[in-house]
Every structure is written in C-alpha cells, then in structure tokens.
Amino acid sequence: MICLAALAVAVPARADEAAAVRDKPNPTLAEVPASGYVPFTGQPFFLLSDASYGTDQEAMVRLEAPGREYKDELARYGGADILVYRVPQPLDFLKAQKNLHRIDVKANYTGEGLANTLAYLWDNWTRQARRAWQRVLSFATRSKAVEAAPQFSMGDQMAAPTRFSNPPQYAPLKGYELLGRFRYPIWEAKPIAPPKDVKLEGSSSEWMPQNVGNVMIPVGKLPAGLYIVEAVIGAYRAHTLLFVSDTVAVTKGTSQGMMVWTAERKSGKPVAGSAVSWTDGVGVLASGTTQADGTAELRHVAPERSYVLGVDRAGGVFISENFYYDSEIYNTKLYAFTDRPLYRPGDDVRVKFIGRNFRSATESTAPAAGDIKLDVIDPTGAPVATTTTRLSGETGADARFTLPSNAQAGGYTLRFDYGGSTYGGAFRVAEYIKPHFDVNLSLDKAGYGTGEAIKGKISLRYPDGKPVKDGKVSVSLRAQQVTMVEGELQYAGLFPVKLEQQELTTDGDGNAALTLPAAKEPSRYVVTVFANDGAAYRVKVTRELLVARGAAPYRLSTAANFTTPGQSVSFNLQPLPAVDGVRGASAPPAKWELVRLESRTRTEGALQPDAKGSATFPVKFEQPGSYTLSVRDAAGNLLAASSHWVAGDGVQTVPGNIEIVFDRDRYQIGDTAEALITFPQPVDDALLTLERDKVERHALLSGGGDWLALQRVTPSQYRARIKIGAEFSPNMTFSALTVRDGDMVFQNAGIVVTQPALDLTVRADKAVYAPGETVTLDLSSALAGKPVPANLTVSVVDEMVYVLQPEVAPSIVDFFYHPRRNSVRTTSSQSFISYDLALSSLPGKPGGTYGRHNERGVKVLERPRRDEQDTAAWVANLQTGADGRARMTFTMPDSLARWRVTVRAVSTTGAADGIVGQRTASIRSDKALYLKWTGPSRFRESDQPRLDMVAFNQTDKDITADWIVSGAGLNINQRVTLKRGANYLHAPLSGTPALQAGIVNAELKQDDRVSDRLQTTVKLDATGWLADRESIVPLTQLQGTRLPLGLPADARDVRLRVVGNTASQFARVADDLIEYPYGCAEQTASRLIPLALAQQSLAATGARLPDGNPAGTQGVDALLRTQRQRLALLAGTNGTFGWWGELTSSSALITSYAYYADWLASRAVGISLPADNWKQVLEAYKRTSQNEPLLHRALALWFANEMGLPVATPLSGVAAELARNAKAPADAEPAPGDSLIFVAPDSPRGRQVAAILTAQLMRQVGQPVPEALVSADIAARTALANDTSPLVQSLLLMGGGRSAADPAPLLARASAAMPTMDRAVALVWLQKGLGGLQGANVAAIQPVLSAGGWQAARSTVGVPTWRWAGAQPPAALDLASTPSDVTTQSAIVSYRSRAPEASRLPITVERKLYRLEPVDAAAPKDDAKAPKRAAADVTANAGITFKAKPVKPGDTLDSNALYVDEVVLTPRQGTYRYGLVEVPLPPGAEVEATTWGIQIDGLKGEPNEGNGPQPFERRAAYEMGQLSYNQPVPTLERPTALRQLVRFSLPGRFALPPARYFRMYQPEAKALQGDGKAASYPFKVE
C-alpha cells in the first residue's frame, strides 16, 4: 500500500507531464479533502495566587475562566494544563521584576504540532487505499478473504471521522526546573462558593452567582521556595507566583523606615537569620537580617508603595506589599476662628489667627512672621471679601471685614494663604427674620420621664399681642430612642420614627392644648408645629424634647477597669449635674445587677444611697470574665451602667480578635498604665509595640522590655504595665500582634495622655449687669498652678447665637494637640496577591471576547433687646503679665441676654511655650422690667398711628408698675399689670396735631423708682412726595461768619458739603451716584463705578477711612462687595444683562456696562477672575447689537476694549454704519435733564458723540479711521465744543479737545438730578482725560457744631460733610471763623422738599386693594380608604386658596389680613420705556417676600377670569423704600396691572400720597394717581 501510495503521489519528471497529471483524476488515490479542522484557540482567563503556603499545606492557585459564556467552547480542551516550576534564585528573580504582582516571564510557544495533521492524512489515505483494493478485487474474493482473516474487515472505520486531540501549544519555560505537569478538569471541579451556612443579607453571598470555571487548583505540597505556576488553555496562557515558606513576615512601615518581624507560621515564635530586602520595584532601598527576636530595622524614606522580600534559612520565600501615606503632617498649623459662628448680612466679621510650627506631635515653635492673604468665599463659591494681615509669632494676626448687606445665607469659607500653604476656616450666615405671628410651644413641666404623658400649650400671637383666633395648627411628632452609656445619653437609632399627626384649632385666646403620648423608653421627641392663620404662608416651629428615664441619670465609676478573680471592687455612684437646672424624676437607686457575659449569670444586691442619691458599694468578682454592672431604681429603670473585666482563664474574645483593656481612659505623665491583653487562643509569642509617628518601642511577649513589664495570667491572657513618659503626650498607640497557624492577628489600643493646657479663669465684677453698664472682666492664665504670661483672645457673644448655630471652630487645645493618628502601617506576607490575565501568543492583536463591557431665614421671636449687637466685645490681643493677670472692660449692650465669654490663649514664653488653653464663662444683662419699641418710628405728618411697646417682665411673678410716656404727642401715666414674659402696651395719641416729631420718653416705675427708661426718636415726613434738591451757595456770599442758605420752609434731611477744585467736585458726584436710591442693572453698575474709582484712589494714596458717619455706614470696600453681589443677582440668561434683571431682554450696552463695572470693582477689591468671564460681553454684542442704536454699540465696544477684549472687527462695522447713516432721519434732541444715552441716542447729538467715540477708539486700537468718519469726527467736535453737557465735555477732554483747567465747572453741572449712567460715564472719561485724581481738598470752613444744629460726618468716599439735626431747616450757616479762601469754594446744600407734582404723561394710574379671604377646601368624598390622611391634607393646604374681595373707599383694613395691592397703568397714547412706579405704604406695612404658591379667585383682568382660583404671580419685581415700594416697568404700551401681596400691621389712620409713574431717564415726565394730591381714600387699619 505504501508503495502504491508513493507511486500515486510521485512527481513527474517533466513540467508538461506534471500538467497532464494535474488535469486528470488519480486512478488510485483521490486528493485529500479539506478537513474543516480549526486549531483550538480558547479564551482569556485569570490565574492568581492570593495566599502563601507552608510546607505542610496543599498549595493552591485560583483560575477564573469565562465559564458562563464560553463553557461549551472551552470544554473541548478538557480543562487547563498546569505546569509548576521552581525558581532557582528567588531574590534575584524578584528584584528583577518591574511588577511583582504580574511578573514578566517569556512564554515558550510552539503551537500544537503535526499530530492532528498526520492523523487526518493517515485516516484519509487508509480509506482511499482500501477502496483501491476494492476496485482491484471482486466482491467474492474480498468476502472469502475476510472469512479467512476477519481482521481484514473494516466495519464502521471507513465512515468514522478522524479523532483530533488538543495537545499543549506551549513548551515548558526555559531556565526553570519543571516539577510537575497535569491537565486539571476545571469544568468538572466544584466552583468557589461561600460556605453553606453563610447567609448574609445584602452581602456578596446573596447577589454574586457561582461561576462555573472559577476554581481552586491544588498543585501539591511543595518544599520551601518560590514557584511559578503556569496555566494553558489552547493558545492562551497565564502564570503566577507561588510563595511557600514556614515563615511569615510582618512589616510595620513608617515615613522614615520599616521594621520587619519574622515568625513561624505555625507557632508564632520569632525566626532569626532571615534575609530581607526593601524595594520600591526599581531598586533596593535597604537590606538586613532578622535578629534573635525576629526583627530587622530598615532605614530609608518610605515611598508610597514598596515591597519587602525575604528568604529564611530553610529557603522559604515571602513577600509583603506596603503602602504608606502620612496620617499626620507636621508643619505650620494655623488656627482661625471668628468672634461668633453665625452672622447676619451686613455684619462685621472679626477673625483671629494663631499659629504654631510643629516638628513632631509635641514639639512646636512660634511661626515665622509673614503675610496672610484672606479670601472669604460665599456658598456659591464667589469671593465676597479679600484682605491681608500680618502674622506675628507671638500674638498671631487678626483681620476684620464686613459682609455684604445682601450676603446669601449658608456656609462661608475662610481661605487664607501663608508661607505657600493654603488653610481654611468657616462660619455661617443667616438672615434673622420675624414671622408675621409668633408660635410659642410651652410645656406644663420643665422635664419629663418615661411613662409620663407630655402636656403643654401652643400659643399664636400677632406682633401687637392680639391672639390668632381659629388658627389651624398641624403637629407632627417623631421619636428617636436613646440609650444611656456610662451615664451619657446617646442615640440608639439613626432616624426618628413618626408617631402621630395632630390637627388642632386655636381658641379665642389663640391657644391650643397639646397632649403627646408617653414614651416607654428614653426618647428624643421632635415636635414640628405648622401654624396657619388663613392669611399667609405657614409658620414652622420645631422643638426637640428629651424624654429621659424616669429617674435622674447617674455616673457609675471605679478606680480600675479590670481586676483579678476574688477581688472586691468598690464602685462609686454619683448623680450627674442638672442640665439647665432641670433634672428628671427623683426615683432613687434601689439595687445593682451584675451580668457575666460569657455565661449570662446574674448577681444582684441592694443599695442604700444617701439623700443626694450617691452611693459607694463593693462588688466581689469570683470568676474571670467580662461583666456589665447596672444600677436600677425600684421600678427597674436603668440609671447607670459600666463594664468591667476580671483577668484569668475564662475571659473570651471574638475569634480572630485580640482584646486590650486599659485600666483607665486617660493618664498623666508619670503614671503607670496597666493593660489586660486577651488573645483569641493560647500563644507562644507575640510582638508588642508602641507606635505613633514610628515604632517607638518594641518587645516580645516572651521576653518583655525595659518599657513594659509583663505578667502571664493564663496561656491566652497577659497583664502589661507601661510607664507613661512625656513622649507619650498627647497619645500613643499600643499594639499587640501574633501569628498562629498561618493567620496574623493584631489589635491597637490608644493610650491617651492629658495634654498640659493653660488654666484660664474669667471673673466678672458682677454676675448680672444692667444694659449700658461697664463690664469688667479679670482674666488670669496659669500652668500647673503657676501664673504664666499668655496672649488671650476674648469674645463676648449673645448666647442665642449658639442656640441657632453651635460653635464651628474646634477647641484650640483639640486643634493643636488633638490625639495623633497612628502613622505606622502594619501588613503581612499573607496578603500578597500575584495574578495574570491569559493572552494568546498567536499573531495579531490579543484576541478573545472576555471582559468587553434658597434661602431661608432663621426665625427669631420677639426678644428684650433694643439693638442688634450680637457681639458685645472682641479683644483680639490681650496680654497677661508675669503674674498671669489681665483686665478688660466694655459697655453692656442694650439687651437682656445671657452672654458667653470665650477665652482662647497661647503662651510663647519659657517652659509654657506652645501651651494653649480655652475657657468659656457666662455673664448676664438683666432687668426686672424692660421696655422695647416694636413699631416703626418714621411716619407722615398727618398719620394717626397706634403706637405699641412691649414690656418684658423678667421675674417669675406678675408685677404692677406705672407706665409713663411723654413726647411726640404722647401723654400717658397709667398703672399696668405685667405678666411674666412679653406684655403688649398700646399708647393712644393725644393733642393737636396728634403726632409730632421728637423724642418719646417712656418709663416703667415701681414704688416711684424707675425700673427702665426708653427713648425713641419719632421722625415725620411730608404727606406728599419728597424730591431731592441741591443749592449751590458760593462762599463769596459770606456775611462775616454767616452764610445765608435760602432753604424752603419744608426742607428736611439737610446736608452741607464744601467743594472747590476738580477732585472735590469729583467726590461729590461720586457720593451722589452711590446714594441714588433705585437699583436696576444700569444704576447698580453706575453705583459700582464711583465706588471702584474711590477705592482705587484711596489705595493709591494709602488713605484709610473710618466706618463712615456716626450711624455706622459700611466702608467703601463693603459697599463694593454688596453692589457686586446685587449686580450678579440681576444677571439673566447666559450671564447677560437687561435694564432690570430678567424682566427685560438682554442688551449689548447694559451687558457691556455691567461687566465693565464689575471689572473695575473686582480689581479694586483684589478679586481675580478668569479671562473667560469677560467673553460674555462679545457674545451678547453678537446676539443683540444689530437692534441697538449706534451710540449704544459704540459705548459697548469702548467698555469691552477697556477690559482688554478684541473689538477691531465690530468697531469697523460701527464706523461703516455711521458713514451710511450720516443723513438718515434722527430723533429729536433731548430736553435739558434728559439722558442722552437712553432718551435720544439717535438724535444728531447722539450720533455726533458716537462718531467721536468710534474714531477715538479706532485710533486707540491702531485701526485706520475711514475718511468719512474722520470728517464726521471733526465736524462733531466743532459742533459740540460749546455743549454744556458733562458727558459730552468729558468725552472731548478724554480725546484731548479741552484743557485740564475746565473740569471743575464742568463737574459742577453734574447735579444729582442728572441721569445716572450719563454721570458715571462722565466720571470715567474725566478721570482718564485727567490721568487720575489726587483726592479731594480739605474743607476750609468749620461750622459751629451743636446737638440741635450742625453735626460733622463723612461721606462714603471720605468727604467731610455736615448734617442738620434741628427741628426746623437752618436759615444760615454759622462758621466758627472766617475762611481764608472764599473765591474758589462753594457750599453745596442737599435737602429734600415737596416735589411739584403734576401729570405730564397721558397715562392713567389706578390703585386698588383686594382683601384675601381664605376658602375652605372640602375633603375628597371618594377617598374612603384614608379619611385621616385626607383631613390632614386639607388642613395642611388650608389658606392656600383665597377669594379676592375688593376694598371700598372708607373700608377699615384688618392688620392681620393679607391684601393684594394692584396698580393699573393705562397709556392713552404712545409707548414708554424705562419707567418706574412708586407706591406709597402706611407705616408698618410690608410686602410679602414670596407668593408661596397661593391661588386667588376674583381678581379682575385675568385672562381666564371667572374660571375659579388662579395661581397668583407677581407681574414685576419690587424693592422696598422707607414708606413705599417701587416696581420697574420696562415698556408700557398697553394697560398693565402690577400686583403685590401686602400687609398693614400697624393700626391707625393714614393719609397717603398718590401712586406715581415716572420715566427713569426723564424724571420730570410723570403720571399720578387720581387728582395727583392724595390717594383714592385714607387708610384706616384696625
């Protein structure tokens, strides 16, 4: 057959014969057909080793194959080929690896060879040869041959396919000793699964399915050494390391070194002579050999990740991976704290910085002197204040800043930089608001115990003291159980559980009785009260009530936490101090109960406490174990509990856990600490260490050391005695570590050492002060009883602040000397993982498909205080002398409150250097009787209000007193009975006129002795509208020392300034802009610009201003930040600006102007903003400029260019349009006093200004000016040369068209009546034209000052001013002496007087009031399944739906009701832009700040009127004035209704001026309500 086959495939001798052979079939054997065989490839899999093994253990590796998706495919291979190699030089091999987890070993790929090919060829050739013989021999011959020789029969072999095998595709690795090779059936093996009895809900055993192919593969018991295990499935191969050693290495890594302890795997005894190397994977850091105690010290700076490699004497190899990171970083620590934790917008914040430079846990020095740059960040991340202060090593540093008056509520961050490092601090801001009625929750008892029903009363009162009748009260009660641990109440659960919901209604006295269920267990009750009077949003009050146990809590203590068997231990039971003077019920202790935890056996004994509840009783512990000792009263209520341990055989610990119990919680230097160490099983040895920044001490359990003494109690329990040295402070970690049966167990326990601290004392000369008295505090500082000098920081703060917001800053002692974290990292060689992902060695990319995959205010009720001063005193640096004493004084604020005195101290001298301390104390300001004025103090001349006062009775009984009031039309002398708390007193007016301007004197007398006196100044405004006026009086009109002023008889708020040179005129204009009352985006920006210019001028000259006038006006810096925030709040979509926030569409001019103002302001206050912040200017210009006048576009580009933005391209477009529109129709010229920018930007003068500005800007940016624009520029300059407008003249001056001597008279024409943007832009151009200003000249006059006459003050930018305090306007100005220069100076007299009111606009103004009456919502009838819930929902929503009832002239208004104030504007012709409506209000009235989702039925003019209640929406934003509110009207071209929700809380009769509409940039263009003389009807409020 072989010969025939050979002949059949013989190659012909010639090429043409070969072609002939190919063309005709083989007469004997046909060609071999394709087999369809594809070599087995496989899929990627993981191979890993996650443990090391001893020589007596079955070593195993883990293989994870993708069995879920590819089991059928991979099962063809029959499992996985496993090969085990021994590494000859293990340490050298490991050191050469870059990644010890995934070693780099080159595979020896050979492919599967020719076996399957030859088998297939043999099978095919055999079948073909047989068929060839069949053709040669007949059937009969073949049959006889088979009968004679049955072995010739083929049977089914002719049709059987070739059986292919899966031979290994990898040869053994070269250079390693192959110890064994086998194919492991991974698909038949049991997959890895958790034990059967393990059922942990939510754990991985529940949601991780068992994966077929995830198996552990045993490789046998191996001699000590390092091995490579290789796994092969088809073309995929992976390898991993396998460590076999009878030695376990434990490492303790620190920042500067590594300690290695080697121990026997079975017994835990130390192993000496092991060679260890410390490597970072790149090179060896240190090497060594373990000593007799098994330890080796390796010194080197620790990298973040490192490895310890080792070989013991038996050849066992071990490896440990170590990670190090600093738990404690010793550098300069800066402690920053504020005078109090909570502030209101506009408050001054005082910050103190104290620093220490730490070199270790206890070593520190004073920091180096340096600058601290402080940034204050609001809750949105925006900076609101920036300042720099100087840090001194001895006294620290302090800073002060003022919050913006519109600061957002929330958490604020103090971010400060010092010495290249950034630090942080915090405080909070909240607006204190008073709800429109008060909710008082008072309980019948001060404290409640378990089992007692809680009863109390909810009282609703309006500000005038009237009860809220039929008020709806929803009470929600939630409870959270608490537990007592060693006398301390702690929460036993995470979340309060809702118990019940009550719906109550107040009676005619405004009261509702409240009964809460009794608590069975000690609980924390959270009572939430929602009250609604049917005319406003609900007022929410939350009260927390601690329901303690039925008896007062006690503390159970003993001298030691553990003792020996048979010892009698004395326990001391003491009642805890009362909290706020409140104790629980007085059930005395009756018995003690002892429970042994190991056996649950109980022992009891009776107690005989003394009268105070104290007791000392012995307890004898017979058996070793863990005990809980409890003290209970006769009813079985737990009063106190404590744990105790008794050394000896029988104490059990949690398996796998070492228990360390110290005899005390805290130690003094020099003490001896005793520790009871209980191991989970008997041990032969263990490693004991003291750790903190490094391993400070170490010893073996079998040998002890010089720093501890050991005593064996049982084979698994030891007692250790440790001497506490100074180096232990503030804490040290004691660690016990043992190795047993291959497992490493260790436990840390802290030794806390009392940190020496300064002993501070605060002694007040009195315990209680009256408001206005001088408080004297004597402070002392001592250390260990000896006086030491120290630097103190003292704050005296209203205790109410800490009720609203607990202290944010940590204690100074905790900050500098808190317990240090343990920086030692403990690991073992048992936890090292080696792994590999199998990859194919076939050509191409790695194959396989495995693994492809608003703001809320803080409500404060009425309090006995006449000022808003929360910080009574703040002393940043108070130095005690060598005797340790210092004294401070301050004046007690006019408030009745409890004041917390907080003293923080640091000593920087002698042995006390670096010692800090903190102490709090309390003082009180109190009076038996205290008066407070609660209503407004500003009225109109014809008002007849009912004035109210609140008299606080601070005693515990009712008092009869005489109430005497005189002044301002009041004359009262009556006897009143004052109940405890707040009493509302109503003061009726008498005399003609009923109300007068002046001082109201009020007194409360007891037995002809004045208990309290109150003075309030009442101010009266004119009945009509007042207009701002200015009068310029040259000093040349002086008559000796008297200057006639010529003021009208109704002039009020008179202020005088003296101006002369350009700088003083500039300051006057800046002051006028800053004080302008309204606040659209343009006016806010126009206020920012002079503030920024003033701040830059002050910074350049180094001048520092006081806080302003005596009233405490904010400084320039604070005003800048306030206005910046206001401007930000007016921003619209995409950061663009319209005229008044989002009420108006975006404008390129307003956006550019607003960003320019913010750019100036941020530079002035030192705030850095990213360059991208200003790009919105150009984006807004692209979107909106095409619809704006050329003057607006030119101005927008000028502002953009000042900010450094590229403007060349849009500027050329403006120049081209100016040339095209030169002859286009123009708007009419503006009237005198009108704004050129907003009223007539397309007038001839507006286009001339645009041409001049555009040409000037093109020259400035280096762009050629077109000839047409050059001609227009020259013509415009000629035409405007004699224009008197300050805006025009400042532009010419900036362009060099006028001399520098002209600006003073130019600025004199910029009066307060000039439109704001025109004035602000004129200031900017003027300053640029003059190259800056040198500051205002000092006034050369000195008026005669008196209490009832002229009073000195300073304006916002620091200009001296004088204000008139007399009742009648001054006829003349009397000077103290004749000034030397009267020719160049003038007196500017600013005042307010009645405005000539006349309607000049064809607009009808109507004002209507609607009283809102709540509509009762009916309960759903079809909700039968949950009637209680339906009722609760109805009550909760009561007062949200209202019916609007029109108020008729003469109707009396209810001071407790809510009204809709509607103003309807109806233009009879034309369209009016930039308008403002001013709506007068009576004193005490206020606009609701929110609409709280109400619905109103009955308002006229609604699109869906008559279809039921409609959601109420404001038609415009509003701003409050003194006795009015105003609403912007961007465009008026059709009838428009403006509505607000208003309250009238002050009873009385009031005559109001008419509501009026005027155009902002044409102030004389007005429209008035009715006849323009008075409102439609007088307001009568009851």
Curated annotation (Swiss-Prot):
Keywords: Protease inhibitor, Signal, Thioester bond. Disulfide bonds: none annotated. Gene3D superfamilies: 1.50.10.20, 2.60.40.1930, Immunoglobulins. There is a cross-link at C1080-Q1083 (Isoglutamyl cysteine thioester (Cys-Gln)). InterPro entries: A2M_N_BRD, Alpha-macroglob_thiol-ester_cl, Ig-like_fold, Macroglobln_a2, MG2, Terpenoid_cyclase/PrenylTrfase, YfhM-like. Residues 1-15 form the signal peptide. GO terms for molecular function: endopeptidase inhibitor activity. Protects the bacterial cell from host peptidases. This is Alpha-2-macroglobulin. It comes from Ralstonia nicotianae (strain ATCC BAA-1114 / GMI1000) (Ralstonia solanacearum).
